[in-house]
């Protein structure tokens, strides 16, 4: 059961698992109801090392895809705070397990809010710039959370943290899929999945290791500052990313 449901556990005990089960059932039924779009040309290639590595090779050669994926690594490596929330809840905010549940849920609420807004918007103008802006905001939200000792300020920071992460994730996924040709998309998205999963775990490790050396708040604040700094560097390092005017231009 997700720790986002911590606040429900405090009041409903084991019944919270029924809530989680209901969510899984709805997700499964939604997936089953998806239409079958076929398998394209039906051509099957033999799997070998060259095929497996071709996704990484394509990412390295495509500057837009490389910039999009690596800025994700930067953001999650330096601004990951979710693994450190128990320390903030107990030692800094003094809000106990119920408060931890609220902290854990707040980024998800922010992400849901951002997703609802994005679903109503037309095609984004300058998606690359919006991506970098959102990650800068992500880093600033991390810094604010690290400095806060007041619950409502921490919640606002986490809300913005989750919302900006959703915006950047949405744009990253679209950019990578539109730029990548059909015959490479599966392999490139596999690389993207590996990078996303690995950077999340490495981010928690980085935060924990830094916290043991300089303290939890300075470690998180430094990570947020590095995220902002690297985002500015990426602005100049990958000029093609910020020059894309419209999503429609990506698959041309």
Give a label for each model feature.
Residues 1-252:
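Alpha-helical transmembrane-bundle signature of multi-pass membrane transport and export proteins
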